[in-house]
Regions:
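PIN-domain endoribonuclease scaffold, especially VapC-family toxins
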Residues: 26-82
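Alpha-helix capping/helix-boundary segments
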Residues: 9-10, 40, 113-114
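Short, flexible helix/strand-to-coil boundary loops that buttress conserved ligand/catalytic motifs
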Residues: 14, 48, 118-121
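Short, well-structured N-terminal submotif of metal-dependent ribonuclease cores
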Residues: 1-36
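Active-site neighborhoods of divalent-metal-dependent phosphate/nucleic-acid chemistry enzymes
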Residues: 71-107, 112, 116
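Acidic, PIN/NYN-like endoribonuclease modules and their adjacent C-terminal/linker elements
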Residues: 102-106, 112-140
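A short acidic, often aromatic-flanked loop/helix-cap motif at beta-alpha or helix-coil junctions
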Residues: 42-43, 81-86, 131-137
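A residue-level structural signature of the nucleotidyltransferase/glycosyltransferase Rossmann-like core
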Residues: 2, 33, 106-107, 124
Length: 140
C-alpha cells in the first residue's frame, strides 16, 4: 500500500505518545510505502521548523530519508504535470499530484479540501488518520 501524508499529520507522527505516532511506527515497520515529492518535503520542512525548531526539523527529515533508504519504503516522485484536482487550495494540489503520480492508495489527511478526490476517477482517496489507523493498523 502506498500513501501520501498531508502536512497536518506529520508533526504528531514523530511525537512519542501522540495519537498519530502509530502511523510513523507502521511506516518504520514497512507496512506501507510513503510517497513524497520535493515540494512536499519542502513544505514538511517549513512546518516542522515552525513547530519544532530547526534542529528537530533536520533530525526528523534526516530520519525520514534514512528509514526510507534502509527500508526502501520512501517513494520519491517528481510530478511534471498538475492535475488541478483541488482548485480551492492550490497548496494541497501538490499532495494530490504526488498521490496520482505515485499511484498511491490514500492521502492521510484531516483536510476537507481533499474530499474533491472522492469520485473523481483518480485512484488515491483521502482517508482520515483515525480511519487509517483503525482500518489498516489495528489488529482484527
Amino acid at each position: 500500500m502506498t500513501v501520501v501524508v498531508d502536512t497536518n499529520v506529520l508533526p504528531g507522527m514523530f511525537t512519542t505518545g501522540h495519537g498519530y505516532r502509530p502511523i510513523a511506527d507502521a511506516w518504520f515497520d514497512g507496512i506501507f510505502v510513503w510517497a513524497v515529492s520535493t515540494e512536499i518535503l519542502l513544505e514538511y520542512e517549513e512546518v516542522l521548523v515552525q513547530l519544532k525548531g530547526h534542529a528537530m526539523a533536520r533530525r526528523i527529515l534526516a530520519l525520514i530519508e534514512r528509514v526510507g533508504a534502509l527500508q526502501g519504503n520512501l517513494h520519491r516522485v517528481s510530478p511534471s504535470f498538475s492535475f488541478r484536482t483541488i482548485p480551492t487550495d492550490l497548496n494541497d494540489d501538490k499532495f494530490a499530484d504526488c498521490a496520482i503520480i505515485a499511484d498511491a492508495d490514500h492521502i492521510i489527511t484531516s483536510d476537507k479540501h481533499f474530499s474533491r478526490l472522492v469520485g473523481s476517477g483518480y485512484k488515491p482517496q483521502p482517508i482520515a488518520l483515525e480511519k487509517f489507523i483503525t482500518r489498516f493498523l489495528t489488529p482484527a
